[in-house]
Amino acid sequence: MAGGHQVRAMSRSEKSDAAIAALGAAPVRCDLEDVTAAHVGDSEAIVHCAAFVEQWGPVDAWKRFNIDGTERMLAASREAGALRFIHISTESVLWRGQHLRDVDETYPRAPNSPYPYSWTKARAEELVVRANGAEFQTIILRPRFIWGPGDTTLLPTLRAMAASGQWMWIDGGRARTSTTHIDNLIHAIELALTKGGGGEAYFVLDDGVRTLREMIGAIAGSQGISLPDREIPAWAADVAGATAEIVWRLFGLRSEPPLTRFSAMIMSREAVLRDGKARAELGYAPVIGVEEGLARMRQA
């Protein structure tokens, strides 16, 4: 909007309507299960960032929203005459349970991953690539570990687990990770509105690599959250996550397990990625550093 764009945003409630309007955008009441070309209207570019990102849920939830929802968004956007479709994805499309070390966009997707979030996002990417054409260009952006002020995913979890005493570092939090501050992702989206190759994927990252303990500890500390030092080895976390899933499914428990296979995996495997492609083809460079981002969180 600061650049003169008119922005519409998908909304599912009156509360979301108000939040979107307060930011100067126009709310459009729909969701991934009923979106049509009429909802897209005369928009020239679509930024698709809605997804089912929960650690736990009904078996079909990830497919319904991440695959079927993306397919509907693509169809609605193309029918409405949109020119560009920017799909916000994730490094999780690569996960099979392995470490990711010095990885770029040539690394193969994992459409048969054992983790529902990973395989559904990987297959959604495949849909986006196949939809690319001369008159409807699709671009994929892959952030890793999105963080920053206003976070509604990591910080509530850290607060709850610290308060309950459930928090434990897996393998001491020694796994190294790339990260993506929300401002850097927004900058990449702005660039992708006019730059980038159709059908291409781009990692969007902060400068540098840190251990999970360094990064999570710093984010928690910026909000006055103190995390305990307790640890559990990765193999034990993997077993605990798998066992919990079996028990929860077997007994139809409605609560979320304390640990899942996916959460055990992402907290113990390295995710060191390269963003040279985004820098070369999008002209991307981080607009905010990690230390500055943490300082802003402390001041918020």
Indicate residue ranges for each PLM-predicted region.
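Short-chain dehydrogenase/reductase
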Residues: A61-I67, V103, S113-E125, F145-G148, ...
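Conserved Rossmann-fold NAD(P)-dependent oxidoreductase catalytic core, especially the SDR/UDP-sugar
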Residues: D68, R72-P116
